[in-house]
Curated annotation (Swiss-Prot):
The entry's keywords: Dipeptidase, Hydrolase, Protease
Keyword Thylakoid carried by entry: no
Natural source organism: Streptococcus pyogenes serotype M1
Gene Ontology molecular functions: cysteine-type exopeptidase activity; dipeptidase activity
Similarity comment: Belongs to the peptidase C69 family.
Keyword Protease belongs to the record: yes
Protein's UniProt name: Probable dipeptidase A
Catalytic residues (UniProt): 10
GO biological process: proteolysis
InterPro entries, per database record: C69_dipept_A-like (IPR047804), Peptidase_C69 (IPR005322)
One of the Pfam families matching this protein, by short name: Peptidase_C69
Catalysed reaction, written as an equation: an L-aminoacyl-L-amino acid + H2O = 2 an L-alpha-amino acid
Top-level class of the enzyme under EC nomenclature: hydrolase
């Protein structure tokens, strides 16, 4: 079998309901391709008749029969499909959300005890295997955990599940083991491509879950690195402390926490950054967009900034990197009519250059501008238009920054206005066509994005190296 496709570059943030501005749970993750690769994406709705009853992986020899009662769910699969589905993020008709996966690290002690399974499951498969069949975030943990125990996995991953009440984060351990923690309601979680959970209580199944034999597994292979008087730290046992982590991973957690807890002074290379923190104020959708667009603004590590040196500007991997494929914020809101409680905010391409667009998820179709992405470059879809804007604006980022900021603010304001207007209509007893509302939002964003592309192209053309100030 050919070498498996792996996407090592995602960044995740999770926001508990008491830490969010509106009492919602928010799960967000960038899906980033490997260096030198770009993966076109699309957003679709998978209806029960389109869900496979027997699933076969492309990346491994894994196959499995699936239940005959799938729910409808949204999905953000690879647009071309040649490497498998890679559904990545979605919300089902029970308003349960799933984001999969955040590739994470492990260590040789774990892999020696429970090797990865070449015929197991991976990121390609997980949303398709789990999301259509779960009615709570906790059910998602238990279903995926059972599949991991039975079939194994060929890679180490972190997976988020959410509903109106809870967010759960599951991390795989070796080939067949797993551990999961409920995100505290008043906290947020930052998770780059590292094993993250740093506290676990085996006697508290309300907030902590794991594979049935995990404690025996830890004892048998001497994986617990904490002293007897300390709480068990899964990150020490199952994670990594590599030089690469301090360049590629820990700085991303640091910059997110620096924005959400500016009063806490930390080292970007520290292995002791907390998995979860209570923010200094409540977190908004705009905050989530900002941290997932981060390129270390206001530090010497910003590749676009005026501080620092040529070396420092390239030392850490930005969150808002060039090879982001898509970013989804899965926003499950309380005290709303069920048909509009779940919102999936979508962005394509490099995050410093794009916007987040809200969609109602209890629908049968997604607007073509977001659903029809081709292999060739066209400006009639959101993915390629965003890719063009980023490539054109990057060489002169500071020149284009005001236009990018205005576009972001205006389009997200329109999104909030749309959400509020629909809620008012429903509460007044009016009938609302949610697919039509999604289409109107898509049409508006298409117009604004085309206008931005026109402006960026014009300005970039005037900044070309071969420009000359004299003309006839």
């Amino acid at each position: 079998m050919d070498k498996k496709i792996q996407r090592f570059s995602c960044t995740t943030i999770l926001v508990g309901k008491k830490a969010s501005y509106d009492g919602s749970t928010m799960v967000a993750r960038t899906e980033d391709s490997q260096n030198g690769d770009f993966t076109p994406k699309k957003m679709i709705v998978v209806k029960p008749e389109d869900q496979p009853r027997h699933y076969r992986s492309v990346q491994s020899s894994f196959e499995m029969d699936l239940p005959d009662n799938p729910m409808t769910y949204t999905s953000v699969p690879d647009a071309l499909g040649k490497d498998g589905i890679w559904a990545e993020a979605g919300v089902n008709e029970a308003n349960v959300a799933m984001s999969a996966t955040e590739t994470i690290t492990t260590n040789s002690r774990v892999l020696g005890a429970d090797p990865l399974v070449a015929s197991g499951i991976g990121e390609e498969d997980m949303v398709t295997l789990v999301l259509p069949y779960i009615r709570s975030a906790r059910e998602g943990v238990l279903r995926l955990g059972a599949i991991l125990e039975d079939y194994g996995t060929y890679e180490s991953n972190g997976v988020a599940f959410s509903d109106e009440h809870d967010i759960w984060w599951l991390e795989t351990i070796g080939g067949h083991h797993w551990i999961a923690r409920r995100v505290p309601d008043d906290a947020y979680v930052t998770n780059p491509n590292q094993f993250g959970i740093d506290h676990f209580e085996f006697n508290n199944p309300e907030d902590y879950l794991c594979s049935a034999d995990l404690k025996d597994f830890i004892d048998t292979y001497h994986l617990d690195l904490t002293y007897s008087h300390e709480h068990f730290n899964p990150r020490y046992a199952f994670g990594s402390q590599r030089d690469k982590d301090r360049q590629y991973n820990t700085p991303r957690a640091w910059i997110m926490q620096k924005f959400l807890n500016p009063e806490i002074v930390q080292d970007p290379r520290s292995f002791a950054l907390a998995w979860c923190q209570k923010p200094y104020r409540k977190i908004t959708v705009e905050d989530v967009k900002y941290v997932l667009s981060s390129h270390y603004q206001d530090t010497g590590y910003d590749p676009y900034g005026s501080e620092g040196t040529p070396v420092s500007k390239k030392v850490f991997r930005p969150i808002g990197i060039n090879r982001t494929s898509q970013t989804a914020i899965l926003h499950i809101r309380p005290n709303k009519p069920q048909e509009i409680a779940a919102i999936q905010w979508m962005a394509y391409g490099s995050m410093p250059f794009n916007t987040m667009v809200p969609f109602f998820t209890q629908v049968k179709t997604i607007p073509d501008y977001f659903a029809n992405t081709y292999e060739n470059v066209f400006t009639d879809n959101f993915y390629w238009t965003n890719r063009l804007i980023a490539a054109l604006a990057d060489p002169h980022y500071n020149h284009h920054e005001t236009d990018l900021d205005n576009y972001l603010e205006e389009t997200m304001a329109k999104g909030h206005a749309m959400l509020h207007a629909v809620e008012v209509q429903l509460l007044a007893g009016e009938t609302v066509d949610l697919e039509e509302e999604n289409q109107k939002m898509s049409d508006y964003v298409q117009g604004e994005t085309q206008t931005l592309l026109n402006k960026i192209l014009f300005d970039a053309s005037n900044l070309m190296t071969n420009r000359f100030s004299l003309s006839d």
